């Protein structure tokens, strides 16, 4: 039921009215109840923060990191040695695969809080449930013991919703709003770790620095039952306009024992941290040795690579020199082949010319032989003709002598003539000339081969 200005109940229009009020003002409180207690300073302070609180209730997609300015607000160098020197977590870039879009919107792209490493620290560790026999030979995995069923969420109070924190703060300030008290009454912290429940069971004003890791507030001074009784007493005293605060303190020895338990836990944690630090130092030293060995191998390999590159360059240069020589030899070989072909052609031409010359020489030799044989024949014919001429001359001389003898004249009485001698007497030359001219004319007519020459 929602009260209006005249105090009448709305009845069936409760859902519509509540929806309208939530849509307009972002709050489940009606305007009459909101502005009824303006004379109270605490109420005025609370309602003046509604707009701010409403802006904090925006969806996760529109949220950004809301934190006060600190040393991380200034730019931090990106040198990895800076984070290693101060034992800081390096910022996770926005292109990290494990960096979800929800973490980017909530914590920002350059925040370490949304990194996978820090998220693993803030999330509770899962606990394997204890298997119990249900009496039917089967094991029931749903154990009723919260130590086995609930995770040990150390930072559960840090991740409590903003509305729950406002309810805590309102109840401690003594605001007489029934809705807030009814909401705070249903708060259940039984599922937490017992030690954490003792530490954070008291309803206190949420302080940002008190919830950071490493900050330990005072132990709880009231149990859950006392808190419930206190809430009931506050609810009972709302009608009278005052809030009666009740508190029950624990025994000092119990508080001291709790402090000692916490200190012993811190000692164990410090020992574990020391062992972990030694392991990390050993691992870092081993990594440095490995890094040094890798650097040495790298420089050795680098020097070897430089030598190989120099040798490769030398081989490359020698290869190109050899290739140029090969090209020259190839050109010379092609030139020699051309010259060989030219020589072969010339030899063939010479051979052909030699054959033709031999044929010509043979023909000339044949002609020479023919001419020689012809000369010999002519020589023989000349000898025959000479013999014939000599015989004719001898016969003519004999005939002349016979005629002279018959005529009684002896012209050759004082002169002896030989056909091998060409000497004649001048006195007888005219007579012989006339005589021989007549005789030779008759003789030429008798020679048969003269006309055939």
UniProtKB/Swiss-Prot annotation:
Record function comment: Component of the spindle pole body (SPB) required for insertion of the nascent SPB into the nuclear envelope and for the proper execution of spindle pole body (SPB) duplication. Connects the central plaque of the SPB with the half-bridge. Required for proper localization of CDC5 at the SPB and for proper M-phase progression.
The protein's predominant localisation is cytoplasm
Annotated GO CC locations: cytoplasm; spindle pole body
Which residues fall in a compositionally biased region of kind Polar residues? 40-55
Organism's domain of life? Eukaryota
Task: Output the InterPro entries linked to this UniProt entry.
Answer: Bbp1_C, Bbp1_N
| Protein name as annotated | Spindle pole component BBP1
Compositionally skewed regions (Low complexity) per UniProt: 61-73
